[in-house]
Amino acid sequence: MASNATDYIKHHLTFWNSDPSAGFWSLHVDTFSISLVLGFLFAAVFAMVARRASIEAPGRLQLFVEMIVELVQTQVREVFHGKSKMIAPLALTIFCWVFLMNFMDLFPVDLFPMAAQWIGYTFFGLEPHHVYFRVVPSADVNATFAMSLSVLILIVGFSIKAKGLGGWGKELLTAPFHSSNPVGAIILAPLNFAFQLVELAAKPISLSLRLFGNLYAGELIFILIALLPWGLQWVLGAPWAIFHILIITLQAFVFMMLTIVYLSLAVEAH
C-alpha cells in the first residue's frame, strides 16, 4: 500500500511498462491488454446477437444493439456524403470500442490494481508496490494517439481513392489559396502545402488530446475521491460517477462523429 497520498496517486497513474529501459519502444501492457479484451468483447457480443437475431421475438439485447446500430447509421447517412460500405461499420466499431474503454473508468479505483498486486505477489513473488495496472485505455495518450493516427491514415487513403494520387497531390499544393496565374500558383504552392500539413496534423492531435484529457481528468478525480474518508467517497463519488456516464458516452460519440466528418471532407473536392 502507498505510504501517503502522493505515492497513492503516483502509483495509480503509473502504467505497467513492459520494459522501462526501452524508452519510446516500451509497451504499456495494461493499456494493450485491456483494449484487446474490450475489442474482443464488443465483437463477440455483436456477433452473438447477429447469429441469434429474431424478427418475431427479439430479445432486449438485440433491441439494444439494433438501437445503437440505427443511431450510428443515421449519423453516417447525414454526415458522410461519399459512397463507402465500410464507414458505418467503422463508426460503429469506434463508438462501441471507445465507449467500453471509457466505461472502465466507472469501476472502483482500487479494484483492478489490488487484484493485480495480489496476483503479482501470490504467483510471481513481486513486491506489491511495484505492481502497476491502469484499466482505462483512453486515459493513456499513447492509445488515443494511436487511434487518431489510424484515422489520419484512413483520411489520406480515402482522399487518394476519391481523387487519385495526382489529384490529392495537386490539392496539397492548390488549396486553400488558388491562383489562375501560373506564377501566382507557384508562389502559393509552398504556403498551401504548409497549411495542408498543419490541417492534417491538427486532426489526429485534437482527436487524441480531447479524448485523453477528458478521461485522464475523470480518472484523476476518482483517485482523489478515493483518498477521502469512506463516507465522503459515496457522497461525492456517486454523483460524479453518474455525471461521468454522460462524459464517457459523449466522448465516444464525439470521436466517432469527428472521424465521419473528417472522412467525408476527405472525399470532397475543394
Swiss-Prot record:
It comes from Chromobacterium violaceum (strain ATCC 12472 / DSM 30191 / JCM 1249 / CCUG 213 / NBRC 12614 / NCIMB 9131 / NCTC 9757 / MK). Keywords: ATP synthesis, Cell inner membrane, Cell membrane, CF(0), Hydrogen ion transport, Ion transport, Membrane, Transmembrane, Transmembrane helix, Transport. GO terms for biological process: proton motive force-driven plasma membrane ATP synthesis. GO terms for molecular function: proton-transporting ATP synthase activity, rotational mechanism. F-type ATPases have 2 components, CF(1) - the catalytic core - and CF(0) - the membrane proton channel. CF(1) has five subunits: alpha(3), beta(3), gamma(1), delta(1), epsilon(1). CF(0) has three main subunits: a(1), b(2) and c(9-12). The alpha and beta chains form an alternating ring which encloses part of the gamma chain. CF(1) is attached to CF(0) by a central stalk formed by the gamma and epsilon chains, while a peripheral stalk is formed by the delta and b chains. InterPro entries: ATP_syn_F0_a_bact/chloroplast, ATP_synth_F0_asu, ATP_synth_F0_asu_AS, F0_ATP_A_sf. This is ATP synthase subunit a. Key component of the proton channel; it plays a direct role in the translocation of protons across the membrane. The chain crosses the membrane at residues 29-49, 87-107, 108-128, 140-160, 182-202, 220-240, 241-261. Its main location: membrane. GO terms for cellular component: plasma membrane; proton-transporting ATP synthase complex. It comes from the Bacteria. It is a multi-pass membrane protein.
